Amino acid sequence: MEMAPAAQVASNPRTVEDIFKDYSARRGALVRALTSDVDEFFGLCDPDKENLCLYGLANGSWEVALPAEEVPPELPEPALGINFARDGMNRRDWLSLVAVHSDSWLVSVAFFFAARLNGNERKRLFNMINDLPTVYEALVDRKHVRDRSGVDSSGKSKHSTKRTGEGQVKRSRVVAEEYEDDDEEHNETFCGTCGGLYNANEFWIGCDICERWFHGKCVRITPAKAEHIKHYKCPDCSSSSSKKTRL
């Protein structure tokens, strides 16, 4: 099957908040491609195909595709030919290389949109971006994340507050085993908004509709507020319900 060029149609965000939302969606997509969806991603990067790129899209999805045909392209392009090195490198090293290039691309797209912002706005955007873990950190810096999560050196798991589907608050574990093979890398929990890895020191809340998990701060829910919510519905599910109601 021939692979078509990526359709990089941008939503053209203009404000700091909208650009950051675009960045977060693309970043979350790339994190998923290199972690929970890594087997699918690996299979799509066939070295026998032409120059392929990994795209994180503004709608939160990802795709492996040929580069855009327009010159110059509508948006900055990600690294070309990521598929060629797939079988010539250690799998973990190859994924790390793709992650580093993906981080560079994400920043270039964000500041492409930020070209008309003033200096203070660009600085604020950069700080917002810098507050999120990079794709590379989400992929390989797991020991650092576990250390920040309060996991002790004995390898025992620590607990933090998460919410169940019944609106109750429960204690859930962050497993602290070393990631000795690639298969174990797929078991991480990522925030449905920012794509950040689970951290036991932060409050998380689960959506009862789509069953995704979110940083409380990303969806503006505090532990105290969560205690009074019987069934939590994330912003995406709330938006979908509103649209159906209006129809």
From Swiss-Prot:
Q: Name one GO molecular function term.
A: transcription cis-regulatory region binding
Annotated region (Disordered) at 147-178
What SMART domains has UniProt attached to this entry?
PHD
Q: What is its main location?
A: nucleus
Localization terms from the record: Nucleus
Looking at the keywords, is Ion transport present? no
Read off the domain note. The PHD-type zinc finger mediates the binding to H3K4me3.
Quaternary state and partners of this protein?
Interacts with H3K4me3 and to a lesser extent with H3K4me2.
Q: What does this protein do?
A: Histone-binding component that specifically recognizes H3 tails trimethylated on 'Lys-4' (H3K4me3), which mark transcription start sites of virtually all active genes.
What is this protein's name? PHD finger protein ALFIN-LIKE 3
